[in-house]
């Protein structure tokens, strides 16, 4: 028996449960090891205990092309704290042991996967209990070697549906992806300063036509109203990265304040689903 069913199974079970509740998913993103490996685990606990439906986690990387200054700051703090890929896999295994039902996704860059060897990376991810991997700088057209390794290890390959994608690309994303579809609300770098407008109904209806995995809207999701709007437009939920990481940046030297602020933010975002 392969593990494939169990891994996308966590996403399917989560989306099915949310559907019966008439709600969408709130999925926060953080960089593993930011601001330190020990505090990173407490941050993840806080997110999950305050309503996160799934997690999107990054490995620290010093040259993130798609990331704005906030996420770059997270990468640099994590690297400065000595977070290695091995430490990331150890953190992931701890999170998985604590939350057996929780979908855990990785969002990272191809260099990190190549550095390990593609197959070895996915094998380690599987051992740590990871459900999905999205490689931000590999478009679906070039993804075959990664997807094959992912599927061989029971991990869902996740693809980005860009806001300017044509039908052909959306069809390919829909056919190639498993778990969920990462829907960009706008092109550009991640960040919260530009509001995520949601003229995404058209893309959402195309994805539905192509029977894509459930779409989660990401990029620029920083307040509850945007979560509500995304779900109203037909998304299965929303991913928020920079807004979460901004809280870590602001309170990185005051653990109590940091965890309290993250708890408040997560509850407010989840309430909007």
UniProtKB/Swiss-Prot annotation:
InterPro entries: Aldolase_TIM, RibuloseP-bd_barrel, Trp_synthase_alpha_AS, Trp_synthase_suA. CDD domains: Tryptophan_synthase_alpha. The keyword Amino-acid biosynthesis applies. It catalyses: (1S,2R)-1-C-(indol-3-yl)glycerol 3-phosphate + L-serine = D-glyceraldehyde 3-phosphate + L-tryptophan + H2O. Pathway: Amino-acid biosynthesis; L-tryptophan biosynthesis; L-tryptophan from chorismate: step 5/5. The active site is at 56 (proton acceptor), 67 (proton acceptor). Its EC number is 4.2.1.20. SUPFAM superfamilies: Ribulose-phoshate binding barrel. GO terms for cellular component: cytosol. Belongs to the TrpA family. Tetramer of two alpha and two beta chains. This is Tryptophan synthase alpha chain. It comes from Shewanella baltica (strain OS195).
